Amino acid sequence: WYRTWVRWEKAQEHEKGAMQKIYRGTMHTQDPYDSKGLKEVGEIPQAEYTYAYLNTAYPCLNEKQLAIGETTFSGPDTLVNPEGMFMIEELERIVLQRCDNARDAIRLIDELTKEYGYGDGGECITIADPNEVWCLEIMGEGKKKKGAIWAAQRVPDGEVSVSANIPRIKYLN
């Protein structure tokens, strides 16, 4: 089961040198203060300022109108790295705290997964800001391999993209 609560997390200033904890199990909490079942898997340097965002099972919107939608497409089990720090919901949370546009969100996902690893299955996230929409598909590189295999494609103006639990990006340059 996924958590059913929603909470608006306030913008915050953080001390220089602070660290931000990364967890597994966040989608299965019963309320915003429930820490049963959470597993701390690591820490990353905290940003000095984080934006307010809507915290749901898959965090989805911040105060800068950066929005993220998620759909799972699984991917091969052989590409899942259980030691990768980030699951998709934690990547979404960090992106919404730190980014104000879709392109920066994609860059941050690339940086975080290269540095700390991606431990989830195949996911497609739609990342939108007031000016453009991108589809990013991501999966692990394999057991014991830090990083992620990902591709992103901009949705052209005037077009619609639908991702219903299947990969949508067909061609890469």
Residue map of PLM features:
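A contiguous strand-loop segment
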Residues: 1-87, 108-173
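Second-shell loop/turn segments in exported
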Residues: 78-81, 90-99
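Cysteine-dependent hydrolase recognition
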Residues: 96, 102, 120
